[in-house]
UniProtKB/Swiss-Prot annotation:
Coiled coil: none
Name listed for the protein in its UniProt record: Protein TIC 214
Phylogenetic lineage: Eukaryota, Viridiplantae, Streptophyta, Embryophyta, Bryophyta
UniProt key word Plastid: yes
Subunit structure comment from the entry: Part of the Tic complex.
Biological process terms in GO annotation: protein transport
Organism of provenance: Physcomitrium patens
Chain segments annotated as transmembrane: 11-31, 58-78, 86-106, 131-151, 167-187, 213-233
Family: Belongs to the TIC214 family.
GO CC annotations on file: chloroplast inner membrane
Keyword annotations from UniProtKB, A to Z: Chloroplast, Membrane, Plastid, Plastid inner membrane, Protein transport, Transmembrane, Transmembrane helix, Transport
Entry membrane topology: Multi-pass membrane protein
Keyword Plastid belongs to the record: yes
Gene giving rise to this polypeptide: TIC214
């Protein structure tokens, strides 16, 4: 027993690791992803939590069981696709989940009874079924609360990938189940904690939980409504398709699509433009998604520019999380190890197959089989349709049963083509037919005749009309028709009545054809008459229908013909309107075009643009300037732009910078500033109140005026601040939302009508009635005139005038302003305006500007803006305008009158009491005198004060106050004075002084105003001069700065220019050095070629060399005058062109090529000087058989590849390289020389041929033909690469495109010569080559003899041995081929019987050819032992069926392979002589019998090396070839040493190997090259990697083709 906990954990961990190793990784993946699906919570989980908290454990477990059952059905729905599409489509969320959620919320919204809060204790309770059903349905519908349900859909992806593995599905389910069980255990723990910790009764807590869950369900419903689009109402674009309204097309669509707008854009959020400055540029249809990342290729890290962004980011995060560090060396080593391992496996497999062949197995069993595609029923697909079939024939060529039977199937082909043509051109034919109908029926031509009924109605119409021209035409038509009838009746002499009737019918037909009543007359009618005419035609059709209907009803027995006529009439009636209407051809176009309308702004409720721009509330025009240009004034909506630059109709994107977290949120807010909005602003004194404190004035006298500071001033100190423009805009923006605009605009209209027609008339009427009551004259006319002047102009929300009567567009939504022109002001009277006019003049003088003129002032139009509460403002949302008070002038007048009346009454009373006061004694006189003196002094003070106050600004106010105060003092003093006379005199003096001072004050004010004006004018002039001087200085400085900038830019440009020139000089110098290198390289290469030629010459004997030189000198001397100049010119031109057109890549390639050629043997010279020597061939054949094939092993294939040339030119090309004249002159020379020459020996003939070959070789190849040869060989390599990669058996005929106009000295290979010819007693056997066989070794032919042009390819060993002596054996007909033995289609049940039967067959065939009796006796004795086998074949009990198995289903029949047939027959079709029956078979591998081995034991002439690559599949062959060619070893020293050894041995034996001419050279060389026989595969693969379509980038790969 383990008591230590760490040991327990270690044991548990070890058991887990062992389980992981044993179990498959899919189980772990399933558990992991199943557990991940528990993270997104849906309504089913919420419902189960609610059941646990409110109704106890039993209800919770029931809810969990329903949830598990629903999830299990979802997992299993993957195996049934209709159920999967039903459950997991997004349409189900909107169509099923939302209504069910609403129904569930309505059910749990209110707590109707406390019984629902009691826990469930028994299964019989009805609530259990509801809980189970709800949880099951919610889990089945699978809605998720998260905005992106990736975790839920992630597991679906793995389900589709591993749905065939049921363990993965089970592990996912158990992972999901374990996660949910853990989740619900946590909920139970939460339930226990709530019950224990709740301070109140748990029933009351349940009420709160009940209410919270109902709110939470409602929040879920709102979330789903926000995520899912409304299915029925979506905004469409302007280019939307117009569907046919008559047909209910949407009913024919499948069930989810007719609920949703499937034409809407899902995720094109933005409209991308090519040009950022213009809006007319086309849209980028496809945006490239280049994402750079490191990728592995050939074991090395390289940059890939088309990586998946999500995958690369995930890989990067995973590496950082797991601390994985990748090393380049380790990666390369791992790659090498894997490749080496794969190579070893393939080689081991090949070795095993070869060993099986050695053990005696049949090739059929050893060859690697290829799997073919088949159905569940076991039926294999045909080879053409098989996707596993490789080659160019898959799905490209239609292969018939036999290409000779094409004429027999021509009729069927034509029929099928017609059917296909009709199907493809269905729309085209329909359009043409419709157009014919329109052209002939629906749109009648003017010269076409009218029907009989149409003619009759037209005649009646013309007769009733007043048109004289038409009546004349009618008379002419009638006259011509009568004459035509008379002529026709004269010609006919008919006796019978039937014949007369028939003749009348014919006459009517002819008459309609020749009738002059055509549609031209209808066109000449007036439009009104034409309309009447067409109506009459319709009416006539109805009449015909009514007549036929009456006839049907009147007749008792209704005939079928009458019914048919009636149906035809109905059809004509209903198709009458359609005939004259053009039938539109409708085609469903792609809805979302790339050209969308993208304006700068979008007017609300118009929807002109296709992309949502900033909303414009309204547009207006302003005319400004002397030119009176119109300016567009637009007001943008101040609402938040939640849909900025989105395509209309597209799905809304999830935006990360603009959140919506409130129930009603008018504006967008960034989450970055949320915390700032939450902070509370501390108490601060408003700036408006601080502005009231005169800070400057306080700081002047701080000690004295501290007491006067008031933070909260009184009413007298407050000065109201006017609203600025910003304040008005803020108020306007505050009111700028639809509901407020709607209420405000209606209030404004009501206020305007209420003011104009209710308030103002009531005021006018009441004022004039009161005037009548006060016995004053009423002012009806003046008031009503002012009332009529007042106008109400409707304006936009910005204040742009629209009109007096009409309202602006969208005024309820955009808003409204009402402008009052000449607003009405109620005045108490209209005559007393003296004081007001004086005040206005004074104010005008004070507020004058520079453009002031003393006598002229323009009158401004008085206006104001009406508010929603009936007030007036100077501007929209401005300050309330103060109206002149109605009672103020009345108060003033009353005060004046009251003062005057009191003074007069006081004087009267005072005069009455004056008589009583006469008794006053003389004592009072002194006091009166003193007081009079005081009065005089006071008068003087008044004068001084007046003079002082003239300079003060407030002289208009202070002066009357001082006068009134002094006047009141005098009155008080006069009351004490008893002398009446003196008081009256003083009063008169004071009044006179007052009037004088007033007149002086007016004069002084005028002077002061004029002085001010002059002072302002002087100041403005001085300022203008000062500012003009400043502007000039600034302009001069700006010019200097521009000049400095230009100089700096010029300096920069010159420096850049010098750099460019310097770079060009460097480039030219570098090119010059490269040219020098090129020249040296050419020299070295030519010297090397000459040296090699000199070395090779040493092989020959000195006698032969001397003879060759003599012949060469003779030929050169003879033809140097004729052709020397031409050859030199050719040399110069070729060299110059090659030097000039050499590229840098080509130069480096040549250098690399020269370096490589130094370390390898070159067989070109021997190939060029090829001669057939029978003696050498025999020796080489013998040596090859005895020699060990150590140099032909698998390890040395690369070196053999470099030493064999894959290329040979055809004779057609050589034939046309040289001109024809040169060939004729040489033939002529050879004829003359051959007549004089004696008979030479065989050695001398050989020497002569060698010398001739060399001379022509020098003449042609060294100069121009060598370059042509290189170019053609290069083209061959690139073209052969393409053709051989697709089909290596196919021989491409691409050299026909490179034909020159020149002629050559070389013969054509396709010359068919049937006889052996002997010239100069020299006998030779001629063997021909065909173009159909792959040519490998180049052979040059020459003009050896004078009389005839022949091919020289001498073979002393004949391919067909003794049979070649007969001409009949060189040819074979097609009929003879059919007599060959067919492939056996029966398989022996036992291998022993099969071997014994083979031996019997071979012995029987040998007996026919054996001549020696001894051998035949021994063979017959052996045959007797096995003769009992033949009896088994003829026994009834045994027979053939019991000894053999029918293997037709495995082995194909003779020529049943269609692709093989096509390849074989296509060769005959391509050849010129494909219709000939005779076929030359000397160059083909014939099926020889086993008897030849026994016949020719001494002569081993059929020695062919075996090709091993056919054992393996082509795919594995290619893989093994590539792996063998790649240098997978890091130490290259061993390889270099091995190469040197091979090169030495090859140099020693190269002459012997090159002179081999076996029966079939293709097989030997193919054996040497079989691993690299298709090296082009590598090039094609690399071509795909580098994304090139030609061979221009092969130099970078450094893949050298075998030369």
């Amino acid at each position: 027993m383990i008591t230590n906990t760490p040991l327990q954990f270690s044991v548990l961990w070890a058991s887990i690791l062992s389980w992981i190793n044993i179990s498959s990784p899919l189980i772990l993946f399933g558990l992991y992803y199943g557990f991940l699906t528990t993270l997104p919570i849906g309504p089913s989980q919420i419902l189960s939590i609610r059941a646990f908290l409110l109704e106890g454990n039993l209800s919770g477990t029931v809810a969990v069981s329903g949830l598990i059952l629903g999830q299990l059905i979802i997992f299993l729905s993957i195996y049934y696709s209709p159920l999967y599409t039903l459950l997991l489509k997004p349409h189900t969320v909107t169509l099923l989940v939302l209504p069910y959620l609403l129904f569930y919320w309505y059910r749990i919204k209110d707590l109707l009874d406390y019984q629902s809060l009691r826990p469930i204790n028994s299964i019989k309770d009805s609530r259990i079924y509801k809980i189970f059903f709800d949880s099951f349905i919610f889990q089945l519908l699978n809605p998720v609360l998260l905005p992106s349900p990736i975790l839920v859909r992630l597991i679906n992806l793995f389900f589709f990938r591993y749905s065939n593995n049921f363990l993965f599905v089970l592990s996912c389910f158990f992972g999901w189940l374990s996660g949910h069980l853990f989740f619900f255990n946590c909920i139970k723990f939460l339930l226990i904690r709530i019950e224990k910790d709740s301070p109140i009764l748990y029933l009351l807590v349940k009420r709160i939980i009940y209410r919270t869950f109902s709110i939470f369900v409602l929040a879920c419903i709102l979330l789903y409504l926000g995520r899912a689009p409304v299915p029925f109402f979506t905004k469409k674009l302007n280019d939307e398709l117009q569907f046919n309204k008559s047909g209910f097309l949407w009913l024919n669509k499948p069930w989810p699509t007719f609920f949703f707008d499937y034409y809407r854009w899902n995720r094109p959020f933005r409209y991308i433009e090519n040009n950022r400055f213009t809006n007319k540029s086309p849209v980028k249809k496809s945006v490239s998604q280049y994402f750079f990342n490191i990728s592995l290729s050939d074991g090395k890290q390289k940059i890939s520019f088309t990586a998946l962004p999500s995958l690369s980011i995930f890989e990067k995060d995973l590496k950082t999380y797991l601390n994985i560090s990748t090393n380049n060396n380790n990666l390369y080593k791992n790659w090498l190890d894997t490749k080496n391992e794969r190579k070893d496996n393939l080689l081991y497999e090949l070795e095993n197959r070869i060993q099986a062949l050695d053990n005696g197995l049949v090739i059929k069993e050893v060859i690697e089989k290829k799997t073919s595609l088949s159905n569940n029923e076991g039926i294999n697909l045909t080879k053409i349709n098989d996707p596993f079939l490789n080659g160019s024939f898959r799905g490209k060529a239609i292969i018939t049963k036999s290409p000779w039977l094409l004429k027999e199937n021509s009729y069927k082909l034509k029929k099928n083509r017609k059917i296909v043509y009709l199907k493809e051109n269905k729309l085209k034919i329909w359009i043409s037919n419709r157009w014919r109908e329109l052209r002939r029926k629906n749109l009648p031509l003017p010269w076409e005749p009218l029907n009989k009924n149409a003619r009759r109605s037209l005649v009646l119409l013309i007769q009733g009309s007043k048109n004289k021209k038409l009546k004349r035409k009618l008379q002419q038509i009638h006259f011509s028709e009568e004459q035509a009838l008379i002529n026709l009746t004269k010609q006919t002499n008919i006796s019978d009545l039937t014949e007369k009737l028939e003749n009348k019918h014919l006459l009517n037909k002819k008459f309609t054809k020749i009738s002059h009543f055509n549609w031209e007359l209808v066109l000449n009618l007036s439009p009104r008459q034409r309309a009447v005419y067409f109506k009459e035609l319709e009416y006539e059709k109805w009449q015909i229908l009514v007549r036929s209907w009456k006839n049907l009803l009147s007749v008792n027995s209704i005939n079928s013909t009458q019914l048919n006529k009636f149906i035809l009439l109905l059809k004509k009636l209903f198709t009458f309107h359609k005939k004259f209407a053009l039938q539109e051809i409708s085609k469903e176009l792609p809805r979302w075009t790339s050209k969308l309308r993208n304006d700068k702004f979008d007017v609300i409720a118009i929807g002109i643009t296709d992309i949502r721009q900033r909303k414009v509330k309204n547009l207006g025009y302003l005319i400004k300037g002397k030119e009176k240009r119109r300016k567009i004034v637009r007001r943008f909506s101040q609402q938040s732009d939640f849909r900025r630059r989105l395509v209309k109709g597209s799905m809304r994107s999830r935006r990360r910078k603009t959140l919506i977290w409130k129930i009603l949120q008018l504006k967008t807010h960034s989450p970055f500033f949320l915390r700032i909005n939450e902070k509370h602003i501390p108490f601060q004194i408003s700036l408006n109140k601080l502005n009231l404190i005169d800070v400057k004035h306080i700081f002047k006298n701080p000690v004295e005026k501290q007491k006067k500071i008031a933070l909260f001033p009184t009413k007298n100190n407050v000065t109201l601040k006017k609203k600025t423009k910003a304040d008005r805009l803020a108020i306007a923006n505050r009111w700028d939302f639809p509901l407020a605009q709607w209420g405000r605009s209606w209030l404004l209209l009501i206020q305007s009508y209420f003011r104009k027609y209710l308030i103002l008339p009531i005021l006018i009427i009441s004022k004039n009635i009161i005037r009548l009551l006060l016995f004053q004259t009423p002012e009806w006319s003046e008031d009503w005139n002012d009332w009529n002047k007042e106008m109400y102009i409707k304006c936009t929300y910005d204040g742009i005038e629209v009109s007096e009567k009409a309202l602006p567009e969208q005024w309820l939504r955009d808003g409204l302003q009402i402008k009052i022109i000449y607003p009405f002001i109620l005045k108490p009277w209209h005559n007393l305006q003296l004081e007001t006019n004086i005040k206005k003049n004074l104010n005008d003088l004070m507020n004058t500007n520079d453009n002031f003129s003393t006598n002229i002032k323009k009158k401004k139009i008085k206006y104001s803006y009406l508010t929603a509460w009936g007030f007036e403002t100077n501007a929209p949302f401005g300050d309330i305008k103060k109206k002149p008070s109605f009672w103020k002038p009345i108060r003033k007048e009353l005060k004046k009158k009251w003062k005057k009346n009191i003074l007069l009454n006081f004087n009267k009373i005072y005069s009455k009491f004056s008589l009583v006061k006469k008794k006053i004694t003389n004592n009072s006189n002194n006091s009166i005198n003193n007081e009079s003196k005081d009065l005089v002094k006071e008068n003087i003070k008044i004068n001084n004060n007046l003079k002082f106050n003239l300079t003060n600004k407030n002289y208009n106010k202070k002066l009357p106050e001082q006068i009134s105060s002094k006047f009141s003092q005098t009155i008080l003093s006069e009351n004490q004075i008893k002398n009446k006379y003196k008081i009256s005199t003083n009063i008169q003096k004071l009044e006179n002084l007052k009037f004088l001072k007033k007149s002086k004050i007016e004069k002084i004010t005028k002077k002061i105003n004029f002085d001010k004006i002059e002072f302002f004018n002087k100041l403005n002039n001085d300022n203008k001069v000062y500012f003009t001087n400043k502007q000039k200085k600034i302009e001069n400085k700006q010019k200097l700065i521009k000049y400095y900038k230009k100089n700096i830019s010029l300096v920069n440009k010159w420096s850049y220019f010098f750099k460019l020139n310097f770079n060009k000089i460097n480039k030219n110098f570098f090119q010059f050095s490269i040219n020098i290198i090129r020249f040296n390289i050419n020299l070295i290469s030519k010297i090397q070629q000459n040296l090699i030629l000199i070395k090779n010459r040493k092989i020959w004997n000195p006698l032969k060399v001397s003879q060759i030189n003599q012949k060469k000198d003779k030929i050169n001397y003879k033809y140097s005058n004729d052709f020397g100049e031409k050859i030199q010119s050719l040399k110069i031109n070729v060299n110059q062109e090659n030097i000039l057109l050499m590229s840098q890549a080509y130069l480096f390639h040549k250098i690399w090529q020269i370096e490589k050629t130094n370390n390898k043997c070159d067989f070109k010279y021997l190939l060029k000087n090829w001669t057939s020597n029978s003696v050498i061939k025999k020796k080489i054949n013998r040596n090859l058989k005895k020699m060990d094939l150590k140099f032909l092993k698998e390890q040395n294939w690369k070196n053999w590849l470099q030493n064999f040339n894959k290329y040979n030119l055809s004779s057609q090309v050589w034939y046309k390289l040289a001109p024809q004249k040169w060939r004729n002159q040489i033939n002529y020379q050879w004829k003359g020389k051959e007549q004089n020459n004696l008979k030479f020996s065989e050695k001398q003939i050989k020497a002569l041929t060698l010398s001739k070959e060399k001379t022509f070789f020098y003449k042609l190849f060294i100069d121009s033909l060598l370059e042509q040869n290189r170019k053609i060989s290069k083209r061959y390599k690139y073209n052969y690469l393409c053709y051989s990669y697709l089909d290596f058996k196919k021989q491409p005929n691409f050299l026909e495109s490179t034909k020159n106009k020149k002629e050559s000295l070389f013969n054509n290979e396709i010359l068919q010569i049937s006889k052996n010819q002997v010239n100069n007693n020299y006998k030779q056997d001629i063997s021909l080559k065909s173009n159909l066989i792959l040519w490998l070794i180049p052979t040059l032919t020459e003009k050896k003899y004078i009389n005839k042009i022949e091919t020289i390819n001498r073979n002393n060993i004949s391919l067909l041995k003794e049979k070649n002596k007969k001409n009949s054996r060189n040819k074979k007909t097609l009929r003879e081929r059919e007599r060959h033995e067919t492939i056996r289609q029966w398989k022996w049940k036992s291998k022993n019987i099969e071997k014994r039967f083979k031996e019997l067959g071979d012995m029987a065939s040998l007996m026919t050819f054996m001549q020696d009796q001894e051998n035949s006796v021994s063979l017959s004795a052996k045959m007797r032992e096995n003769l009992d086998l033949f009896r088994l074949l003829f026994c009834r009990d045994v027979g053939v069926n019991k000894l053999t198995i029918n293997s037709e289903h495995r082995l194909p029949r003779v020529l049943d392979d269609q692709i093989l047939m096509y390849k074989v027959i296509s060769l005959f079709l391509k050849s010129k002589n494909r219709f000939k029956k005779n076929v030359n078979i000397t160059n083909f591998n014939l099926s020889t019998s086993r008897i030849e081995f026994f016949q020719n034991n001494n002569q081993n002439n059929n020695f062919n090396l075996i090709n091993l690559e056919d054992i393996m599949l082509l795919k594995h062959r290619k893989e093994l070839k590539v792996l063998n060619l790649l240098n997978l070893k890091q130490n290259t020293n061993q390889i270099l040493n091995f190469n040197k050894v091979i090169l030495k041995e090859n140099k020693r034996k190269r002459i012997e190997l090159n002179k081999i001419q076996n029966k079939n050279q293709n097989l030997t060389i193919k054996h040497f090259l079989w691993p690299t026989f298709r090296l082009e595969d590598l090039a094609c693969v690399n071509r795909f990697w580098f994304n090139t379509s030609n061979g221009s980038r092969f130099t970078m790969l450094r893949i050298r083709m075998y030369t």
